[in-house]
């Protein structure tokens, strides 16, 4: 693959140079490079681990902040810094606009229209079509017949006011 790679400047080489001469010189150069790489490796193939703290301080003097005349061993656990513990968080229910599960559905009951309401009566009232053929609602009787007869009929003034309001 490396032999197949050509020098990008070979296009500008002299007219009479042959490609076989350049191939052999490329191979020689690559062989020299690999030899130089092999001899230039200063690192050994085995990697050494870093020494532990106790082993390190045997060969190096201890810093003053670690000196404890009573205890010759270093208490590394007391030197460790830990993050403060956070209290457990309370669970809060999220407020969402998501659709609730089907078990929690409650069918909203709609009120039925009153039984005496009839669309023919409603439209008749809207257009004030109160002719003979106009539908009339059944008058509900709240009072017993005896008490209804005792009530006096409305006076003439009340009837005039009612007709004026109705003729608007």
Swiss-Prot record:
Basic and acidic residues bias locations: 46-56
Region span, Disordered: 1-56, 124-168
Record field: compositional bias (Acidic residues): 145-160
InterPro entries: DUF4660 (IPR029089)
Annotated family: Belongs to the UPF0690 family.
Protein name, as recorded: UPF0690 protein C1orf52 homolog B
Species in which this protein is naturally found: Xenopus laevis
């Amino acid at each position: 693959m490396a032999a197949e790679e050509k020098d990008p400047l070979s296009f500008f080489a002299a007219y009479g140079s042959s490609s076989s001469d350049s191939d052999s010189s490329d191979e020689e150069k690559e062989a020299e490079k690999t030899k130089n790489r092999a001899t230039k490796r200063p690192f050994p193939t085995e990697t050494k681990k870093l020494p532990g703290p106790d082993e390190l301080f045997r060969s190096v003097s201890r810093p003053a902040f670690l000196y404890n005349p009573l205890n010759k061993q270093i208490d590394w656990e007391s030197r460790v810094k830990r993050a403060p513990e956070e209290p457990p968080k309370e669970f809060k229910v999220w407020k969402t606009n998501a659709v609730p599960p089907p078990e929690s559905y409650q069918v909203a009951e709609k009120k039925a229209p009153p039984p005496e309401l009839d669309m023919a009566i409603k439209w008749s009232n809207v257009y004030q079509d109160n002719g003979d053929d106009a539908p009339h609602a059944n008058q509900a009787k709240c009072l017993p017949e005896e008490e209804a007869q005792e009530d006096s009929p409305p006076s003439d003034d009340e009837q005039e006011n009612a007709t004026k309001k109705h003729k608007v």
